[in-house]
A protein has these predicted regions:
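Acidic ATP/Mg2+-coordinating residue in the GHKL
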Residues: 89
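Conserved catalytic core of two-component histidine kinases
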Residues: 75-77, 120, 131
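Flexible helix-coil linker/loop segments in the cytosolic histidine kinase module
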Residues: 1-10
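ATP phosphate-binding glycine-rich loop and adjacent ATP-lid/helix-beta elements
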Residues: 96-125
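Conserved ATP-binding N-box helix of the HATPase_c
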Residues: 48-71
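Glycine-rich nucleotide-binding loop
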Residues: 82, 93, 123-130
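Short beta-strand/loop element within the Bergerat-fold HATPase_c
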Residues: 70-81
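Helix-loop-beta hinge of the Bergerat
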Residues: 10-47
Length: 135
């Protein structure tokens, strides 16, 4: 994570490259949607690092636990400079007693550290993770 690349465009590209590389040898297909009109928008190093580590943990969980064959990554920046990264899989979801793993706790802490929010939606049709932060 080179600090000279601290903008949304480079961050999104880095996350997508990581996801595709990490899941390359699996049956999991990566689909990406970018809803960002200003990819040059600056992103602090701390925010970039924490968001990336949340994405990495999410993808690791999908690989290890989901039994998914697709993952959808959506990036959105609204007019109020609120950035959302959504990672969704079409796997089996998880039992509520599995909702307290260290990885999930770490994602919550990382988002708190940058003044953001983390939300997880779970169903038998997969898991949806939302990471939201004001830039």
């Amino acid at each position: 994570l080179n600090s000279t690349n601290d903008n949304l465009g480079n961050f999104m590209q880095y996350v997508v490259q990581y996801a595709e590389g990490f899941l390359k040898k699996t049956e999991i297909k990566v689909s990406v949607r970018r809803e960002v009109d200003s990819p040059e928008t600056k992103l602090s190093s701390e925010m970039r690092r924490n968001l990336f580590l949340c994405a990495k943990e999410s993808l690791n969980n999908i690989y290890k636990h989901s039994k998914a064959n697709e993952v959808y990554i959506t990036f959105n920046l609204n007019a109020d400079e609120v950035f959302t990264m959504q990672i969704v899989d079409n796997g089996v979801g998880f039992h509520n007693n599995q909702n307290s793993g260290y990885g999930l706790q770490n994602m919550q802490k990382r988002m708190n550290d940058v003044g953001g929010k983390y939300e997880i939606c779970n169903s038998e049709k997969g898991v949806c993770l939302y990471f939201v932060v004001k830039i």
